[in-house]
C-alpha cells in the first residue's frame, strides 16, 4: 500500500489554496491542500507498526512547526506546477531530515521545497497565463502547525489519514 507524510495547514490557508486548486489542480478531489514532508512510498502491515511507533517518537521530539506562506511560485521549467511557497525554517528542515533517515532512510526524490500545490497538469499556454496572473498577487499567511499526518492511498487514487502525530509531546486529541 502507498503511504505519504504531510502537514495540513489551517482552514484559512486551505480555503485560499482551494479557490485556485478547484480550477487548476488535477488532484483537487484526491487530497486537501497540504505540505508534503515525505513523498509516497510503499510499506506493508509489519513495517507500518514500526513506522507509526517511530513517527510518534519523532513527533514527541519536534516542536510546533511555524509556517509562513509568502508568495506564488513555480517549478518551471522542470514542471508546470504552480504553488504557494512555504518559507523553509529549521523546524521544517529538521523534520524533513528525520523523515528521510533511520527507519525512513532513503534519499528524497526531490530537493525539499516546502509548498502547497495550487496548479498542475496545465498545458503550456494555460500555465503561462495562470502563473503570470497569480505571481503578482500579495500572499502572506503565518501560523503554527501542531501535528503531521500519515496518509494512505485508496484504490480510487484519493488519500486519507491513517494516523495523526501531535508534535511537542502532546497527546492526540
From Swiss-Prot:
<keyword id="KW-0378">Hydrolase</keyword>
<comment type="similarity">
    <text>Belongs to the 2H phosphoesterase superfamily. YjcG family.</text>
</comment>
<dbReference type="GO" id="GO:0016788">
    <property type="term" value="F:hydrolase activity, acting on ester bonds"/>
</dbReference>
<dbReference type="Pfam" id="PF13563">
    <property type="entry name" value="2_5_RNA_ligase2"/>
</dbReference>
<feature type="short sequence motif" description="HXTX 2">
    <location>
        <begin position="115"/>
        <end position="118"/>
    </location>
</feature>
<feature type="active site" description="Proton donor">
    <location>
        <position position="34"/>
    </location>
</feature>
<dbReference type="InterPro" id="IPR050580">
    <property type="entry name" value="2H_phosphoesterase_YjcG-like"/>
</dbReference>
<protein>
    <recommendedName>
        <fullName>Putative phosphoesterase GTNG_0743</fullName>
        <ecNumber>3.1.-.-</ecNumber>
    </recommendedName>
</protein>
<feature type="active site" description="Proton acceptor">
    <location>
        <position position="115"/>
    </location>
</feature>
<dbReference type="InterPro" id="IPR022932">
    <property type="entry name" value="YjcG"/>
</dbReference>
<dbReference type="InterPro" id="IPR009097">
    <property type="entry name" value="Cyclic_Pdiesterase"/>
</dbReference>
<feature type="short sequence motif" description="HXTX 1">
    <location>
        <begin position="34"/>
        <end position="37"/>
    </location>
</feature>
